């Protein structure tokens, strides 16, 4: 059951606010990256100005805990056919400082730019209602609500720019964080979370997909070889983050089930989580359960009696609100748990029926204990939990829970029962009583 603060947060998520934000973003006509940055009513500049003011309204209610900044740079033509003249790319970043572990960050957000059928048409209408005003609306609504609370770790709410031109805003922010050695523990991308209907009319209003990369994109050859040798390719940080989100956010409070997809993204598609993965961070992407491709990246037109275009009329605002509850639960649960244990290992130097684990306590929030999780290798989610207390090693002496037959994970447990994502143990060699 969510704690009292989280229950209160969930009760405040407003369908009307989410709808209002989406309609306002659509009203700018186009939010194409190359569109006007000076017109006060049309184009990406007008959208940026309005969004910045709305995030600042949230910050003004935070008693100084939240700050709003721009992460900006100039993108020049040359290596990107979708950039045909120099353009300013500005991501809006609202940072809510953690009350106890402010150096550990969790980030969520969507992209506020849009496009139509032609990726360099910066003058034609590109309403971008689902893609991705729906995700930005969630980020803004959660910033508004969370500003009144004190999560223990830092939460960042973003509106990315330049996504449709090649994930440009996310790439720059990820590199900015990497250059500053920011401890970003997870990035949660919200890209198309506003409609549950497919092109054939199929609807799935209580499910949301979560795309989770396998073997990390930046993993070195030695670690990758070890991961593959122990069958750990399905237990990357991103996939264990996905299991965490499934566990905390699939419930009656959100009225949703998180459907974890073991892929980086959909076929031939990309999202703002990828640059964070490429920078060495853990990132995942929420996407609605079904898609209608007559509504994505389409000119607003009618052909053979059928309406095309990413219009507000296709939105299911109740679904969008439930998606916001999933994200709120995810961010609150991550930010109030201790960090995951580090240097998690399992002794494989001897052929025996015992499983000997060791790990290091994480920095930041105090840990009240640890749990060893396990599941059959064919199971998608954790099925069993062993509470091992507040120790940094454990000998599992059960011959029926054999390390050759299951996948293990170790997670931290903190105050209030908040738990970290699990970590896959890698093989190590040590003395019997290490």
Swiss-Prot record:
GO biological process: proteolysis
Record-annotated Fibronectin type-III domain positions: 340-433
Cofactors: Zn(2+)
Assigned keywords, A-Z: Glycoprotein, Hydrolase, Metal-binding, Metalloprotease, Protease, Secreted, Signal, Zinc
EC top class named in words: hydrolase
Residues holding Zn(2+) 2: 131, 164
Family (UniProt): Belongs to the peptidase M28 family. M28B subfamily.
This protein's name: Probable zinc metalloprotease PTRG_04772
Organism for this UniProt entry: Pyrenophora tritici-repentis (strain Pt-1C-BFP)
């Amino acid at each position: 059951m969510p704690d009292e603060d989280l229950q209160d947060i969930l009760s405040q998520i407003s369908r009307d606010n989410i709808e209002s934000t989406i309609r306002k973003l659509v009203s700018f006509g186009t939010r194409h990256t190359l569109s006007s940055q000076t017109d006060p009513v049309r184009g990406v500049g007008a959208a940026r100005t309005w969004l910045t003011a709305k995030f600042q309204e949230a910050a003004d209610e935070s008693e100084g805990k939240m700050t709003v900044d721009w992460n900006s740079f100039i993108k020049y033509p040359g290596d990107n056919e979708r950039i045909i003249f120099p353009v300013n790319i500005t991501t809006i970043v609202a940072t809510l400082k953690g009350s106890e572990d402010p150096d550990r960050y969790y980030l969520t957000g969507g992209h506020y730019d849009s496009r139509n059928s032609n990726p360099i048409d910066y003058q034609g209408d590109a309403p971008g209602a689902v893609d991705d005003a729906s995700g930005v609306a969630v980020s803004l609504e959660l910033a508004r609500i969370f500003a009144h609370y004190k999560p223990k770790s830092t939460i960042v709410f973003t509106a990315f720019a330049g996504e449709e031109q090649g994930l440009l805003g996310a790439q720059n922010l990820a590199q900015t964080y990497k250059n500053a050695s920011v401890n970003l523990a997870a990035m949660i991308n919200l890209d198309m979370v506003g409609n549950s209907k497919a092109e054939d009319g199929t609807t799935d209003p209580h499910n949301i997909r979560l795309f989770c990369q396998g073997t990390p994109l930046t993993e070195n050859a030695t670690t990758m070889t070890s991961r593959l040798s122990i069958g750990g390719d399905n237990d990357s940080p991103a996939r264990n983050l996905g299991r965490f989100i499934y566990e905390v956010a699939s419930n009656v409070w959100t009225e949703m089930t998180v459907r974890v997809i073991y892929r980086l993204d959909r076929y031939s598609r990309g999202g703002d989580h990828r640059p964070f993965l490429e920078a060495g961070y853990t990132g995942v992407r929420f996407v609605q359960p079904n898609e209608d491709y007559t509504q994505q990246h389409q000119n607003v037109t009618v052909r053979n009696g059928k309406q095309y275009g990413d219009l507000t009329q296709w939105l299911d605002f109740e679904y969008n609100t439930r998606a916001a509850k999933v994200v709120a639960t995810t961010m609150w649960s991550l930010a109030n748990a201790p960090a995951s244990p580090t240097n998690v290992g399992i002794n494989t130097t001897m052929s025996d029926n015992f499983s000997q684990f060791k790990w290091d306590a994480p920095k930041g929030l105090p840990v009240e204990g640890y749990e060893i999780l396990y599941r059959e290798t064919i199971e998608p989610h954790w099925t069993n939990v062993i509470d091992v207390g507040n120790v940094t090693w454990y000998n599992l002496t059960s011959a029926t829970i054999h390390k050759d037959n299951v996948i293990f994970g170790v997670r931290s447990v903190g105050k209030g029962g908040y738990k970290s994502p699990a970590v896959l143990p890698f093989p190590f060699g040590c003395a019997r009583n290490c």
